[in-house]
């Protein structure tokens, strides 16, 4: 099992992927070529990644019991898109390591946090303005 982010994942290990879309499918194919097995967790029974994965679980991202079972069956977990509930990753993170860290998901789910994070790294972004109401929108357009 992976203990720290820098620990290598040994071939034959099981990578858990939350999400079973096309990106999950491509990740599963690449992982298999490198000697890893993949367990896909998706609420979609016919998720494309399930077709190319050794294991799969069909359940809601809010089903904490199934998430815990999934986490116990893998060596590390990743996610293919940012619409996974943060609570799901927190549940998994108590059992199996999540890469990237679950905090990356929290940033990716909030566009203002995402812009602020990128800006804090010294990377330029397009101009943006937080808009919560009509007054904010009017101010942003000035």
Which residues make up each language-model segment?
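Active-site nucleotide/adenylate-binding loops and adjacent lid/helix of ATP-dependent enzymes
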Residues: 107-142
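ATP-binding N-terminal substructure of ATP-dependent carboxylate-amine bond-forming enzymes
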Residues: 1-116, 135
